[in-house]
């Protein structure tokens, strides 16, 4: 049982802080974020991000989207070494054409051992189960219609979402997201900035559309439909896409 919480603590080193703050800005109109259908993805193409912690490259993150019957499946791998510790996260996420969850599974491999996290849905219930050292803890909750499932520290989840909606500058989009590693749902406010921002991605300087989320303390940088960088200022982490 102790290891479950220890591993969860390790995961949160690399994830965003769950500090919930009210975010409001009168200059932005507000719309609900709704996905009508999945679009803008490349079937079977591996997307790779370099993982930086405190400006030091500590690993990589990759994801792939494939068709899975009438649904879609996203496989992700995070491989990080930081502070003398190794951490590997392998996830499989199945979702429908509206980007709503069907099932989720995560395997966490760390120096302390292996932890399995799974999320299942039944009727209006959502349950995350955490298994370590042969002990399973179930964390039940109510599923609200339209809630997205997103691993906040994994850019693939966000990139598929952003590619599947038409985002307008100067608009704040609201949504509910369920984060399996926290086994909780959060209200998110995605603010699309009116002005582009120049950033370096590898050796290229790109003028990016900027999306900020205050509750999860995340910043996203979009260039020509691609999520090229995701930042968590509070955690000192940056995930930057390898452009090919």
Give the role of each language-model region.
Residues 78, 108, 130-132, 159:
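Short, structured patches in soluble enzyme cores that scaffold and shape functional sites
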């Amino acid at each position: 049982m102790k290891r479950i919480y220890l591993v969860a603590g390790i995961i949160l080193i690399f994830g965003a802080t769950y500090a919930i703050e009210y975010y409001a800005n009168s200059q932005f109109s507000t719309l609900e974020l709704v996905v009508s259908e999945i679009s803008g993805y490349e079937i079977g193409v591996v997307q790779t991000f370099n993982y930086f912690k405190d400006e030091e490259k500590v690993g990589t993150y990759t994801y792939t989207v494939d068709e899975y019957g009438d649904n879609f499946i996203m496989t992700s791998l995070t491989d990080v070494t930081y502070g003398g510790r190794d951490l590997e996260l392998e996830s499989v996420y199945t979702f429908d054409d509206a980007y709503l969850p069907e099932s989720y599974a995560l395997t966490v491999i760390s120096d302390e051992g292996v932890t399995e996290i799974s999320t299942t849905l039944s009727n209006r219930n959502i349950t995350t189960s955490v298994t370590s050292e042969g002990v399973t803890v179930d964390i039940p909750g109510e599923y609200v219609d339209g809630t997205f499932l997103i691993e906040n520290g994994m850019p693939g989840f966000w990139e598929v979402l952003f590619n599947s909606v038409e985002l307008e500058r100067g608009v704040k989009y609201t949504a509910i997201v369920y984060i399996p590693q926290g086994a909780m749902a959060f209200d998110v406010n995605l603010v699309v900035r009116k002005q582009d921002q120049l950033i370096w991605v590898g050796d290229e300087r790109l003028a990016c559309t900027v999306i900020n989320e205050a509750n999860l303390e995340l910043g996203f940088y979009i260039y020509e439909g691609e999520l090229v960088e995701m930042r968590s200022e509070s955690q000192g982490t940056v995930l930057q896409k390898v452009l090919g």
